[in-house]
């Protein structure tokens, strides 16, 4: 009974974190390149061709294809939740060098999880997009797991060679272009440090380093990378110093600013060390050195992107990972120092992050519920148009309501030919719609004529779909109050052969509609 009581808070904490991620992914439709990688399939031949002609990310590409192959929203949601939790867990456990749960983790785990959510440079595309997560969450999970084992081997002076760590080393090296070079660099620096300290090097570190370097070579030297680069003359045609200058002056600062909340969390923890003499005397200096080192590596992962013609926000997830490690090292050192001010300080920062997380999460949940409703509308249009024999048609783009920031949006990239291939037609185009049309899926239906149907809910969303273009005004009875809305003031869009109109009419039930 006592054992059960001890593990209950830990289980509840992990379960809540799991459900938080699971629920958002449950409401997330497959989108963007998810369709492309589903069509890619899981055959070795198709992935070899992909490697030779497009991308060296064999680990990420196979991960996304395997997940999408299931065509199961349950699998998608579980994979998103598990990958996020395991990623955060390795971040939490690296400073201690053990995977066993200890007292400090009751504060450290929520601190890292909350910070991962509220400071993520592009949460929608790194966590809730299957292909994006495969490229920037799963691969970074392999990297941080490798860092954990490599760090543990170093501090415990372990000599054993593990085939699993060797495989993990290769996977970490073959992660993504911003992080992979630093995996190889860290492994080489670890060998150099041991050689300097002991005048000899453990064979396991040599093996793991060679595996990591091999993974980096497979990733970076992919023929597909060179084929893609051949079409980027606007970038590669410039002298290298010009590319570096443009990157440093126009791109780096904007991308580093994306994770500003992580800097605030890190600064607050550092201030606890600086301004408390007792903490400075008792804190583990090795943890501070490790924190400084991973910050430098994190900045390096951003600087190295001068080599790439594009620098999407989601790529910053690798940089963000190293700042999370820095937060973990300092917070762990504060908690293990035994100084009350350090423990209280970490607890206070965790509570602050938790408050922001709660606000952000509720916005995200509401927003993704609405996009799930929009997906129902899109699927109905696809079914209807295919049944009518159409080979080319339009679906509305997703519309996001207010989130913490635009980084919460999943990717809106849309390839008409790929969507068409997935649904066995020639092409499916998208059209931008500047209103939330989920009310069409889950609102009350009002048949106004053979050509016109209205939809409403008690939250104030009101939409009309008509085969004829509307003019004049619409009069509504909302909770017994009359409201007149000029049609020209309603938001509108034309989807295929239909005219869509939308207005926010205030909360209440619509009981009557007339033109």
Where would I find each of the regions flagged by the language model?
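Short, Lys/Arg-rich, polar N-terminal cytosolic tail immediately upstream
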Residues: 1-5
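Intrinsically disordered, polar/acidic, low-complexity terminal segments
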Residues: 8-50, 54, 64, 68-87, ...
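Transmembrane catalytic cores of multi-pass membrane glycosyltransferases
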Residues: 23-78, 130, 173-299, 306-315
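Transmembrane alpha-helical segments
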Residues: 84-95, 142-154, 185-192, 267-273, ...
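Signature aromatic-anchored transmembrane alpha helix within multi-pass, membrane-resident enzymes
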Residues: 286-290, 334-359
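Alpha-helical transmembrane segments
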Residues: 8-23, 107-114, 166-167, 208-215, ...
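Membrane-interface micro-motifs in multi-pass membrane enzymes
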Residues: 105-151, 259-262, 299-330
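Short hydrophobic alpha-helices at membrane interfaces in multi-pass membrane enzymes
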Residues: 152-171, 206-207
